[in-house]
Amino acid sequence: MADQLTIALSKGRIYKDTLPLLEAANIIPQEDPSKSRKLIIPTNHEHVRLLIVRATDAPTYVAHGAADIGVAGKDVLMEAPSDNLNELLDLQIAKCKLMVAGPKEAKPHGHRLKIATKYIQSAKAYYAQKGQQVDLIKLYGSMEIAPLIDLADKIVDLVDTGNTLKANGLVPEEHIADISSRLIVNEHAYKTKFKQINDIVEKFRSAI
């Protein structure tokens, strides 16, 4: 009998975009997470289950072995790298860009640049690479407000269409990284359940 295989996924866009890949691997969820309160979803294989978690928590579940594989955004992985997991595949889904954005008509400032962002580690690494010292302000959402009320000079955030930036008088200025969702694996699980996991990887790869 095959070992139990647990796949960590988050609700919303990533789950929706991952469904065709799961189907290509003949893994069919038995319930719709958007309509169910269950956080552990059975599939058409009794030894394969889905763990529905927050997008930012998926790497943690995989790194600690609570899930064998999972899907996580590159933005999340850049913020919290772990020695216990590996990226297996760029799934080419949930694509966007991590960018610096600022007011269309930037005001002169005589202080060290203030950057509002949810992505503290990525922003810190980016500005360190440029040799520029900045003050980073941690926010969890509605980043676009910060420059409008002088909380920050610029923001570092994910940009998809750019419509939200435009609506708030901001423009993208600097590209930090291309973001997409990645298939990640727990290092120990990859050794002990290699065939099961590799079969899924190859089917995902063929469907991308």
Swiss-Prot record:
GO BP of this protein: L-histidine biosynthetic process
Matching Gene3D superfamilies: Periplasmic binding protein-like II
Organism domain of life: Bacteria
Keyword match NAD: no
Molecular function per GO: ATP binding; ATP phosphoribosyltransferase activity
InterPro entries: ATP_PRibTrfase_cat (IPR013820), ATP_PRibTrfase_CS (IPR018198), ATP_PRibTrfase_HisG (IPR001348), ATP_PRibTrfase_HisG_short (IPR024893)
Catalysed reaction, written as an equation: 1-(5-phospho-beta-D-ribosyl)-ATP + diphosphate = 5-phospho-alpha-D-ribose 1-diphosphate + ATP
Pathway where it operates: Amino-acid biosynthesis; L-histidine biosynthesis; L-histidine from 5-phospho-alpha-D-ribose 1-diphosphate: step 1/9
Compartment(s) of residence: Cytoplasm
Glycosyltransferase in keyword set: yes
This protein's name: ATP phosphoribosyltransferase
Organism of derivation: Hydrogenovibrio crunogenus (strain DSM 25203 / XCL-2) (Thiomicrospira crunogena)
